[in-house]
Regions:
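N-terminal secretory signal peptides that target proteins for export/translocation
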Residues: 1-17
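Bacterial N-terminal signal peptides
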Residues: 21-30
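Sec/Tat signal peptide C-region and signal peptidase I cleavage site
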Residues: 31-37
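Polar, glycine-rich mid-to-C-terminal structural blocks
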Residues: 402-436
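An often Trp-containing, charged/polar helix-loop segment at the C-terminal end
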Residues: 450-451, 502-553, 561
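Walker A/P-loop NTP-binding active-site region of P-loop NTPases
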Residues: 498
Length: 570
C-alpha cells in the first residue's frame, strides 16, 4: 500500500492567537490587563465584537448560571507532530502503531499536576466541577456569571446578532487566568453560532428558491423504500455490494448536539420491514438531555438529523458492535468524550456545522484522534461553495475527512451503483478559515487548473456520497417521509460506517485500525489505480466549482467502491 508522510498536516502557520498576540491586542483595544495574567492559546472574542460591528446591548445577570468546558493544552505539540509523521509514514517502523488513551495522556496530555491545578483554580473561584478528565484534557465547570467574570477577568455582555433576529452573549475581552500556564480554550463563553444540522428539507429548499418542490429534483426511482426512496441498506448495496463485512467488532460514534427518541428509529425499521440488532447508547457527555425535545423547535421533538445519522450508519454497517451517540452542549465536551470513551469509537460521523470563535479550538482533539487511530468524518455542508457565511467548519479542518454530496442512481431496488453526478448544493471549496493546505493535497496531480483548487489553503471536500432528496426518514415523533430530506448529513455517517467495514477486515488480519485516511487515499488516488476504488464523479456542479476528472471541489475524489476496502486493508 502506498502512503504519504503526514508531515505538514500540522501546518506551520495557522491563525493562532497566542498569549503574546492577545496581549498586544489587549493593549491596542485599550483593555485593562492583569499583572502576570495568563492569556489563552486560542481566541474567545468574536470578530464582530472585536471590530465593533456590534455594540453591547446589555450584560448577563450576575446570578445566571453558566456551564463551561476548560481545555488544557497539549504537553508536547512538537513531539506529537513528529509522532504523527512516523505513525502515518508507510516506511516507518511505527507505521499505524497507534497509541492507547492512557499512552497518549502520558506522552502528550496534561500532567497530573497541571490538571489538578486547573481543578483547584476552578473550585477556588466558586465553580462546581461537573465533569471532564485528565485523559480528555478538559475540566467541566458550572457557576454564576459573576464567578466567570471574576475568574477570567471579562465582562459577559449581550449583543444584537448582526445576521440573525436574536441576542447573543459573549466576553468583551480575551479571558485571562492566574494560573502559571496558559489554558488552550474555554468552551461555552458565547452563543454567537448555534450549531445546525447539515440537512435540507425539499419543501423548505423549494420555498427559499421560489420554485415548486417537484422542480427541485425528481423522486428516487430505484430505492427499496416507500415511493422508491433510498434506505440505508440501499447505500450499502450501491457502495459495498457484498455480505461478508458488516462492521462486526467495530464501534462507531455519532457527534450530536441534540438527543433522540429511539421510537423514531424503531418506526423506520418497522416500516421498511428490517430489524436492527446493533446496541445503541445515548451518552450525555456533560449533562445535556438525551431527549429530542428542543426549545428552538418550540418545545417539540427535533431528531431528524439524529435519526438519519443512525439509519445511514446502521444501513452501511448492520453488524456493528456498538453505536454511541455522544450528546453535549459544547464541541469540546463532545469530542473529548469521543477520544476517551470505552470502547473507543474508531470511526465517527459528524453532520453538524457551526462557526467556532477560533478554528484551532479542536485541533488538539483531532490530532489526538489521528494518534489513536480514529477517523472523524464531517459533512461538508449544503450551501454550495464554502464561505464565511455558510459555516464550513469543522469540515475544512485538516485532520477531518470532509464529505461532500452526490446524486446517486442505482440499477434497481437494493441494486448496485448505476450512475452518479455532483449534488447541486454540495459544500466545498477553499477553506474560509484559511487553514493551510496539508501535505497530501500538495501531491502532484491533486490541485490543477481544471478543479481550480488552492495551492495555499485546505481544499474540500475529500470524498462524497449520495446527498440528494431521495431518502426515507422517520423522525420528530410524528411522521415518516419519502424523498423529502437530503444533505451531506446523509453522506458523513455513510462514510464513517464504510470505514467500519475496512477496520473489520483489518481486524480479521490481525492489523490495527486504518486511522486517518486522507494521507492514504490521496497518495493512492494520484496513481493509475484511482478508478478501481472510487467512483470518479465527472458531471454536475455546485456553486463556483464543477465536478471534473480526478479530484474536485464539489465531490472530492468521489464515492467509494467495494475495492477501496481491499486497498485500505490489503
Amino acid at each position: 500500500m502506498n502512503g504519504v508522510i503526514l508531515g505538514s498536516v500540522v501546518p506551520m502557520v495557522r491563525h493562532r492567537s497566542g498569549p503574546v498576540v492577545l496581549a498586544i491586542a489587549a493593549m491596542v483595544f485599550g483593555v485593562t490587563t492583569h499583572l502576570h495574567a495568563q492569556y489563552m492559546s486560542t481566541r474567545h472574542v468574536r470578530d464582530v465584537v472585536r471590530d465593533s460591528t456590534v455594540t453591547p446591548a446589555g450584560r448577563l445577570p450576575a446570578t445566571q448560571a453558566m456551564s463551561l468546558n476548560i481545555v488544557l493544552p497539549l504537553r508536547d505539540p512538537a513531539g506529537l507532530k513528529l509522532f504523527l509523521e512516523d505513525v502515518y509514514n508507510p516506511t516507518s517502523s511505527s507505521y499505524r502503531h497507534f497509541l492507547t488513551v492512557p499512552e497518549f495522556t502520558e506522552r502528550f496530555g496534561p500532567t497530573q499536576a497541571d490538571y489538578d491545578a486547573v481543578v483547584h483554580f476552578a473550585k477556588a473561584n466558586g465553580f462546581t466541577v461537573t465533569g471532564g478528565s485528565r485523559d480528555g484534557m478538559d475540566v467541566q465547570i458550572k457557576g454564576p456569571v459573576s464567578a466567570v467574570e471574576a475568574a477570567f477577568h471579562v465582562s459577559m455582555m449581550t449583543y444584537q446578532h448582526p445576521t440573525e433576529n436574536r441576542i447573543f452573549y459573549g466576553p468583551d475581552r480575551e479571558p485571562t487566568t492566574s494560573l502559571s500556564f496558559p489554558l488552550w480554550h474555554i468552551s461555552g463563553m458565547d452563543n454567537y453560532s448555534i450549531p445546525h444540522p447539515m440537512l435540507v428539507r425539499k419543501s423548505d429548499y423549494a420555498k427559499a428558491h421560489g420554485i415548486s418542490p417537484e422542480a427541485v429534483v425528481k423522486h428516487a426511482t430505484t430505492g427499496s423504500g416507500p415511493s422508491a426512496s433510498f434506505l440505508g441498506s440501499d447505500m450499502r448495496a450501491a457502495y459495498y455490494g457484498g455480505t461478508a463485512l458488516t462492521g462486526a467488532g467495530q464501534n462507531l460514534g455519532l457527534f450530536e448536539f441534540l438527543g433522540t427518541d429511539l421510537a423514531d428509529l424503531n418506526t423506520y425499521y418497522k416500516n421498511v420491514k428490517q430489524t436492527n440488532t446493533v446496541p445503541i447508547t445515548l451518552l450525555s457527555v456533560d449533562g445535556t438531555s438525551t431527549s429530542c425535545v428542543d426549545s428552538r423547535a418550540g418545545g417539540r421533538c427535533d431528531d431528524t438529523e439524529q435519526t438519519l445519522d443512525m439509519t445511514q450508519a446502521l444501513g452501511m454497517a448492520p453488524g456493528l458492535s456498538s453505536l454511541v451517540m455522544y450528546i453535549g452542549s459544547t464541541d469540546t465536551a463532545i469530542i473529548s468524550a469521543m477520544t476517551t470513551h470505552k470502547p473507543l469509537p474508531t470511526t465517527i460521523g459528524c453532520s453538524w456545522g457551526w462557526t467556532p470563535v477560533d478554528p484551532n479550538t479542536l485541533d488538539p482533539y483531532f490530532q489526538k484522534m489521528a494518534a489513536q487511530g480514529q477517523n472523524f468524518f464531517a459533512a461538508s455542508g449544503d450551501d454550495s461553495t464554502w464561505s464565511k457565511r455558510n459555516e464550513a467548519w469543522p469540515a475544512d479542518d485538516d485532520y477531518v475527512v470532509s464529505v461532500g454530496g452526490t446524486d446517486l442512481t442505482t440499477s434497481s431496488a437494493a441494486g448496485p451503483w448505476a450512475s452518479e453526478t455532483a449534488w447541486t448544493d454540495s459544500g466545498g471549496g477553499i477553506s474560509p478559515d484559511k487553514i493551510a493546505i496539508p501535505s497530501w493535497q500538495k501531491l502532484s496531480g491533486v490541485i490543477n487548473s481544471s478543479n481550480k483548487g488552492s495551492t495555499t489553503y485546505r481544499n474540500g471536500p475529500d470524498v462524497s456520497a449520495n446527498a440528494n432528496f431521495t431518502f426515507y426518514t422517520c423522525a420528530d415523533q410524528t411522521a415518516c417521509l419519502a424523498n423529502e430530506y437530503g444533505g451531506t448529513s446523509f453522506a458523513a455517517p455513510m462514510w464513517a460506517a464504510f470505514i467500519a467495514l475496512v477496520n473489520q477486515q483489518l481486524a480479521t488480519e490481525g492489523e490495527s485500525t486504518i486511522g486517518f485516511i486522507n494521507p492514504t487515499i490521496y497518495s493512492e488516488n494520484v496513481t493509475s489505480s484511482y478508478g478501481t476504488h472510487f467512483h470518479d464523479i465527472t458531471s454536475g456542479k455546485s456553486g463556483s466549482y464543477s465536478a471534473v476528472t480526478g479530484y474536485d471541489l464539489v465531490t472530492g475524489w468521489g464515492s467509494p467502491k467495494a475495492a477501496l476496502i481491499n486497498t485500505l486493508a490489503p
